[in-house]
Amino acid sequence: LWVRAEQRPNEARVGLTPAGAKTLKQAGFQVTVEQSTQRAIDLEGYSASGCTIAPENAWPDAPDDAVIFGLKELPKDETPLRHRHIMFGHAFKGQHDGKALLRRFQAGGGTLYDLEYLVDDTGRRLAAFGYWAGYAGAAVSLKCWAAQQHNTLCGAIAAYTDKNALLADLHKDLAKEPANPPRAI
């Protein structure tokens, strides 16, 4: 498994934690993790879990049998894709650039395992938005509400290092508000 660095600006998420990588290593998988200038999780955890560390954006030169794992879109170019890729490809519902991505897989002989279509035996989606996506969405909603109380717009929100950093920032915003919080978000 080759965990690639995300190329999309402001994308700090990663689909595999160091603990998950350690579990895969213990099960006999070889795990390579690319360096990343924007990933929220430090590379040291992956090193400590026994992962091989590769330079950022080295996945095109990964061994043929590597399964490339990422979350969001690949860089837009015409390079044929020869590997198996696990990601949210945004390619099968008429999304922008979907046809071009599929042509790249066809040209290179690679395969796209689109997480949007990963389902269990009953057809239930397995890679749907989880607890933390909802948690972050609620926090951002509260930040927007707090800004609106001062007739301003909520500014850009950068990635937080962890839940406590998010909560500290949110508490700071809410401390400026009257003791009359919203009843619904």
Language-model-detected regions and their locations in the chain:
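An N-terminal-biased, well-structured beta-alpha scaffold segment characteristic
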Residues: 1-104
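Glycine/serine-rich phosphate-binding loop and adjoining beta1-alpha1 elements at the start
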Residues: 5, 76-184
